[in-house]
Amino acid sequence: MHYVSWDRTERDTPKLLAEAGPEVLGVFQENRASVNGEIWELTAAPEVGAVATRGGEEIVRAYDPLRRGERVRVDIEGREYTMVGETSRNWVIDDADGNKVAQFTRENSGVRKAILEFEGETSLPLTDIVGLAWVSRELLEARQVGAANAVIATLTVLSAVALAVFLL
């Protein structure tokens, strides 16, 4: 498998696909996912990080805020990864040895499709593939919301200034 992508045909239950499908790696809901017949409980807080548990045992943890910062440390069943923002839109994922294992982007419908592209044919365990895909999607969504809020705030201030100038 060279990449994973998200099928958002059903908005409330996006599916994580191996490449463009049809193989489904997981079906996600707001607070849970079904991965390989197992239920993952999901908790994501953009200001704090994200955690996935399976049977009460933590399997995925993003230690850093998803909304801001240039690095997000991720632990998946004891294996360490770091998501590094090369630019505000382009990210790479390095393993504990600093080797690039994957990349993702916000460009070209990146938030909707959230493609996680691996360095060649990946040999990562399924838990790592799904965990990295989930955290990368949460990171992209958190940053999209942050950017949208900044635009709304700027437009509100500019509208108030324009109204004040017009009335005076």
Task: Describe each region flagged by the PLM.
Residues 1-139:
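Cationic, beta-structured binding surfaces that engage anionic biopolymers and membranes
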Residues 134-168:
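C-terminal single-pass membrane-anchor helix
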